[in-house]
Regions:
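Preference for extracellular/luminal or secreted protein segments
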Residues: 1-53, 270-271, 291-381
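Enzymes and membrane/adaptor proteins characterized by extended Gly/Ser/Thr/Asp/Glu-rich
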Residues: 52-176, 195, 200-215, 243-259, ...
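Short helix-capping segments at alpha-helix termini
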Residues: 81-86, 184-188, 236, 270-275, ...
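Phosphate/pyrophosphate-binding betaalpha-module
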Residues: 183-193, 224-237
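Extracellular glycoside hydrolase catalytic/binding regions
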Residues: 214-226
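Catalytic PLP-binding core of fold-type I/II PLP enzymes
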Residues: 265-278, 282
């Protein structure tokens, strides 16, 4: 009996304390809503100070953080040391033109084909394997989240998304994206799917300043673009990224989806019953940063139901701005509480068992890609 009591006490004492918003200040809760970035390759005093004072919930890796394999792993290890063990550390790794892991110079990641090639092959087992490779290599550097897969549907020849999309056929997108998703999460990596509610039909790139329009009715959107999101919501996806395109036939204005309560709250939350974390595409992208004030972006997005922001321009500045808006009544503090709780709950679920594995750039994975996608052999030699 004494032994059982001792073991129970030992396990309780050694279990890492879970995060909770109960003892967080307003500023700390706002900090959870930020996914920050620093273009450096080692965690310096300025970053340490920012992590400890502002307590951001996430960090997005850029090419500047991914210089060499060992330095990258050390950088991410230090992020956890100063930002919290289960800080959300995410990286863009779609394949094709968007794969940050290939920036690592001294140890080459497996080069992933673009989504269009994956859709053209349309082999579910291959798509799962690709997701598995992505998840394994993301976890190998120590990160725990990836912006993949892309769920947008459209013709690559006319869409601003190009070959980042799997197909213009919704069924091909659904089946292959679902397998990529499963391969990623089977490595204990969070899959952040994008770009809700679908930007495949826009010809304007939201990175630029021009307003990006999708001229679809809700019925048209529901029958096509929303179907991959519905599929993955039913499969338990934990994070959905909302894009910056506008849907005037649905919202009756040109407000970007990322700032629209109709898109985020009415459709994603209430209609589709998504209960995870809602993230929006980077706040420094031209479509919103050049057309809305910084204050308007955060106030409108939070009031719409957005939980997390990528690439804020200075953590303290943004926390100050949001805190002031809460205190003035422009943002209900309950919206902050809801966001912080969703993010904290996600962080508490993150598993560390596969993190920092040694399965980065394995020759067997590169050979697999070569066998299935011959044009990509040159990158995987």
């Amino acid at each position: 009996m004494c032994l059982i009591v001792f073991i129970t006490i030992f396990l309780l004492c050694n279990k890492e304390k879970e995060l909770s918003i109960d003892n967080m200040s307003l500023r700390e809760k706002i900090g959870q809503m930020l996914m920050v970035y620093y273009n450096i390759d080692e965690v310096d005093e300025d970053l340490i100070k920012s992590l400890e004072e502002n307590k951001p919930g996430g960090f997005i890796l850029t090419g500047a953080n991914l210089i060499s394999y060992d330095r990258t792993r050390k950088f991410i290890s230090d992020l956890y040391k100063y930002g919290g063990k289960n800080m959300i550390v995410a990286v863009d790794q779609e394949g094709g033109s968007v794969q940050r892991l290939y920036d690592i110079k001294d140890k080459k990641a497996t080069f992933i084909p673009n989504a269009y090639e994956i859709g053209k092959l349309n082999d579910k087992s291959v798509s799962y394997k690709i997701g598995n490779i992505i998840g394994t290599e993301v976890s190998s550097i120590g990160a725990n989240a990836v912006f993949s897969p892309v769920l947008d549907i459209g013709d690559y020849k006319t869409s601003a998304m190009g070959k980042r999309m799997i197909s213009d056929d919704k069924d091909i997108v659904i089946s292959n994206a679902s397998e990529i998703y499963k391969g990623i999460i089977d490595n204990d990596v969070i899959s952040i799917v994008k770009h809700f509610p679908g930007i495949g039909d826009t010809v304007d790139d939201t990175h630029d300043s021009k307003v990006s329009i999708v001229n679809k009715t809700y019925e048209e959107l529901y029958n096509t673009d929303l179907q991959p999101f519905i599929k993955l919501i039913n499969e338990g996806v934990e994070v959905i990224m909302v894009g910056h395109s506008s849907y005037p036939k649905i919202t009756n204005d040109n407000l970007p989806a990322s700032l629209s309560s109709i898109i985020v709250n009415d459709i994603l939350r209430n209609e589709l019953k998504f209960d995870g974390v809602v993230m929006i595409d980077a706040v420094n992208m031209g479509t919103i940063s050049n057309n809305y004030s910084e204050k308007d972006i955060y106030v409108k997005a939070i009031n719409a139901g957005v939980n997390m922001f990528i690439m804020p321009n200075g953590s303290k500045r943004v926390i100050d701005l949001i805190e002031k808006a809460v205190k003035s009544g422009e943002i209900d503090e309950k919206m902050i509480d809801d966001s912080a709780k969703r993010i904290v709950d996600l962080r508490n679920k993150i598993s560390n068992k596969n993190k920092f594995n040694n399965n980065f750039g394995l020759s067997i994975n590169k050979k697999f890609i070569c066998e299935k996608f011959h044009d990509y052999c040159i990158y995987n030699e």
